[in-house]
């Protein structure tokens, strides 16, 4: 599981950098400032959670079962949260109205929060 978590973290980190550069250079010409800021929010949260997964994957104190649960909450949360933000920020560049799927953004955010809560509870329950 550690290998899967760490490779996923590396992929999320790499794509966050690519998307950040894409937003700063290519999208700067076609999006307004609010849309660019929204896009950047998606990039930031993707990178935050790439680093979080890297920590989880490298940690020796987190049980494998807990790692697996956190992994699935975080990866689904990033896809829903950051993915929907990318689509919503670039909505005017496509023929499809991505505002129809905007409801998944807060669901993704909730999944990210649950991943953090799961880590908190796991550490809180450990004997001191």
Protein language model features and the residues they cover:
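Polytopic transmembrane helical bundles with strong interfacial aromatic enrichment
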Residues: 1-128
């Amino acid at each position: 599981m550690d290998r899967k978590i760490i490779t996923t973290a590396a992929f999320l980190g790499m794509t966050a950098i690519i998307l950040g550069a894409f937003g700063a250079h290519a999208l700067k010409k076609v999006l307004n400032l609010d849309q660019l800021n929204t896009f950047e929010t998606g990039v930031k949260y993707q990178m935050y959670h790439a680093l979080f997964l890297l920590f989880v994957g490298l940690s020796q104190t987190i049980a494998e079962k807990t790692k697996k649960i956190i992994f699935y909450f975080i990866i689904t949360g990033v896809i829903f949260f950051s993915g929907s933000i990318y689509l919503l920020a670039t909505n005017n560049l496509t023929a499809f109205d991505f505002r129809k799927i905007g409801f998944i953004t807060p669901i993704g955010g909730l999944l990210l929060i649950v991943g953090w809560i799961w880590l908190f509870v796991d550490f809180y329950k450990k004997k001191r």
